[in-house]
UniProtKB/Swiss-Prot annotation:
It catalyses: alpha-D-glucosamine 6-phosphate + H2O = beta-D-fructose 6-phosphate + NH4(+). The keyword Nucleus does not apply. GO terms for molecular function: glucosamine-6-phosphate deaminase activity; identical protein binding. Induction: By N-acetylglucosamine. This is Glucosamine-6-phosphate isomerase. The active site is at D68, E137, H139, E144. GO terms for biological process: carbohydrate metabolic process; filamentous growth; filamentous growth of a population of unicellular organisms in response to biotic stimulus; glucosamine catabolic process; N-acetylglucosamine catabolic process; N-acetylneuraminate catabolic process. The gene is NAG1. Belongs to the glucosamine/galactosamine-6-phosphate isomerase family.
Length: 248
């Protein structure tokens, strides 16, 4: 793993945004980009929007695949990841709408939806760069503790810690947080991506970062430890996330 530590979240976001811009601009073909939601990547998206408006990068030849979506939420729901991505990113850049791929939380046939998502990724050959974040207890996308290294896109049940962490987006009411989601699997990320970049911000991510970098490799208790099994991973964090334990 390669690591880069910054004193504050803004500098970390700027570094990773510029990193993504350089990758897109140096790729003469379609660039396939994996994307997360949540608070950690918001700063990156803001920087990418600014760069797009300034003409420093275009997304006309970029194809995106998002990591996950809540099961049962319509794309128009304010808490859906469809809504988040369009509100925070897609509505403000020049990406063709047909290039955007997000799992459908209202799919009539969940198994078919997940299988088709895997097929769509394969159709593009490889994901050039998969951007991700870490859950407080080391989950990657919605791959919770116990997830297999060979897991693919599927329906997952959210654990209590994830529900607690996400309830702030639902008026701090845990009962309103969906209990299930659709998520790419560990294999989907690791085996289809040429490079993985992880943004880790804040003191509450110290534990997850430590398990990711210094923990037992391929430990199902901490799915982010599977990242040690990939040859090209960049971790970008702030001082608060790095803490004293992380040997970065």
């Amino acid at each position: 793993m390669r690591q880069a530590i910054f004193s504050n979240p803004n500098d970390a976001a700027e570094y990773l945004a510029n990193y993504i811009i350089a990758k897109i601009n140096s790729t003469p073909r379609t660039f396939v980009l994996g994307l997360p939601t949540g608070s950690s990547p918001e700063g990156i998206y803001a920087k990418l929007i600014e760069a797009n408006k300034q003409g420093r990068v275009s997304f006309k030849n970029v194809v995106t695949f998002n990591m996950d979506e809540y099961l049962g939420l319509a794309p128009s729901d304010l808490q859906s990841y469809h809504y988040f991505m369009y509100d925070k990113f897609f509505n403000h850049i020049d990406i063709p709408r047909e290039n955007i791929h997000i799992l459908n939380g209202l799919a009539a046939n969940i198994d078919e939806e997940c299988a088709n998502y895997e097929k769509k990724i394969k159709q593009y050959g490889r994901i050039d760069l998969f951007l991700g974040g870490l859950g407080p207890e080391g989950h990657l996308a919605f791959n919770e503790a116990g997830s297999s290294r060979n897991s693919k896109t599927r329906k997952v049940e959210l654990v209590e810690s994830t529900i607690k962490a996400n309830c702030r987006f639902f008026g701090n009411d845990e009962s309103k947080v969906p209990k299930y989601a659709l998520s790419v699997g560990i294999s989907t990320i690791l085996d289809n991506s040429d490079e993985i970049a992880i943004i880790v911000l804040g003191k509450n991510k110290q534990f997850a970062l430590d398990k990711t970098v210094n923990g037992k490799p391929n430990d199902p208790k901490y799915p982010s430890s599977y990242l040690q099994d990939h040859a090209n991973v960049l971790i970008v964090c702030d001082n608060a996330a790095a803490g004293l334990k992380s040997k970065l």
